[in-house]
Structure formats: structure tokens, C-alpha cells
Amino acid sequence: MNEQPAACRIKVEALGAGFAPAAEQWAERLGLALQVDEAEFALQVGEQGLQLQQLGPDAPGPVRVDFVEGGAAHRRLYGGGSGQMIAKAVGVAQGVRPRVLDATAGLGKDGFVLATLGCEMSLIERQPLIGALLEDGLARAAQDAEVGPIVARMHLLKGNSIELMRNWQGEPPQVIYLDPMFPHREKSALVKKEMRLFRPLVGDDNDAPALLAAALALASHRVVVKRPRKAPCIEGPKPSHGLEGKSSRYDIYPKKALKA
């Protein structure tokens, strides 16, 4: 996701006096103000953690990261385990739990699914506001007895995905997973809410070809790209094959076989 466009006016807001110190800390870290005239978004700090709220009469509800309850918990318990398409795409199999870099982490949903299945995950989210939501969600989840051991496998990195991949230090990830923002329209309520919120902040990933090139250069075993089902492949080398679902597909770029 692209860095925050300057046109968006964002303030940090404490949802109660007791959260003012934390709000000040987030404002300082992110270079945001506590008071902004005609703000379009509020990064709110309250008892449920950090959340991003679009302002205005037609704004959807707040977006926050919650790995303990809600959709993440339901998918963890009932989501299909290693039979899920994303698991097959990254190469999860009997005795195989690859080390995965999710270079477009967003709110961490796909990374959490893979961590639940036992994969060691590195995550990069280059949009600072979304990265802050993810950092806060991981910190809260770490305190939960059931979910804590799962998020302990999720390691959040800060910075630009392409630069971090090009300058990677140490053992490379076996699999790199990409889900670039694509200018498409879907009708589910969840997509509406999150995409309506994020699109003004992050735009589309116009550097997706460079993202793919950096991933192919770094990954030791394969690169997986999630796309809307009918969207074209990312410009560049073509995938060897794909897995297709109802609304999305996974383009797979293998380099060598994953073995137990």
C-alpha cells in the first residue's frame, strides 16, 4: 500500500481522559496532530485499543485489528484449517510449514490465518496508519492465553516493502505473499467498509510490478499473489499456475519445491 497521501486530514483522538497520554504518544510517533480543522479521519485511542474512524455523515464504523474475537476468531476455529485455499497456495502440507513474508500485510488477516496453521510470519505494512492498527492489534492479542502463542509467530516490520525486500538481511523467506491494492469493486459489507476507509489513505498499488520483482528476487521457494478472480496478472513474469475461488485467485510463481 502506498504511503499516506498528504491530502487526507487526520487527527488523533482520545476516547476519554485516561487515554490522552497514549493518544499523545501515537500522535508523536506518526507525526499527526491532536487537533485538525475539518479532519477527514480520526485515529482513536480507547479501551478497545486503536481504531481508525472516518468522519462525516455517511462514514462507516471504525476499523480496528482484533485477532481474539469476531471474524478472526471464527476463521481460526471454523475456517477449514490447512484445506483453505491460502494454505494450499503458500505450500502448507503435511510436515511443511514454510517461513512466509507477507509484504502487503494490511490488517494482518491473511498473516494470522497462516500463523494459526503454524507458519512463522514476517509482515510488512508500509502505510503508517494501517501499520499502527496492526501493531496495536498484535500487542493486545499477545495478552490472550489462546491467541498469544499464535501472534508470537507474527513479526511486524516497518518500512517500504520493496526496499526491505531488496535490502533483506539474513535467511530469506521461503514464501513471499502479496495482496496488492487493486482498483476493483466488490459488494461484500466487509470490503465496502474497509475499502471505503482505506482507499483515500492508500490509493492503489501502482508499483505492484516492482513489488513482484523484488519478491521473486528474494523468496527462496515461491511467490504467491492474491488477485480479484477476474483481474489481470501483475505485469512481469507470468505465474506457472493459480488457484481460483469465488471472488479471488492465487497466482503462484514457484522457484523450487517445498519439502518436509
Curated annotation (Swiss-Prot):
Enzyme class, broadest EC rank: transferase
SUPFAM superfamilies: S-adenosyl-L-methionine-dependent methyltransferases
InterPro entries, sorted: 16SrRNA_methylTrfase_J (IPR007536), SAM-dependent_MTases_sf (IPR029063)
Keyword Cytoplasm (UniProt): yes
Keywords recorded for this protein, A-Z: Cytoplasm, Methyltransferase, rRNA processing, S-adenosyl-L-methionine, Transferase
Localization per Swiss-Prot or TrEMBL: Cytoplasm
Phosphoprotein in keyword set: no
Record's catalysed reaction(s): guanosine(1516) in 16S rRNA + S-adenosyl-L-methionine = N(2)-methylguanosine(1516) in 16S rRNA + S-adenosyl-L-homocysteine + H(+)
GO CC terms in record: cytoplasm
EC number: 2.1.1.242
Pfam families reported in the protein's UniProt record: SAM_MT (PF04445)
Binding site for S-adenosyl-L-methionine: E125, R126, D179
Described function: Specifically methylates the guanosine in position 1516 of 16S rRNA.
Record-stated family: Belongs to the methyltransferase superfamily. RsmJ family.
Name of this protein: Ribosomal RNA small subunit methyltransferase J
Annotated organism of origin: Pseudomonas fluorescens (strain ATCC BAA-477 / NRRL B-23932 / Pf-5)
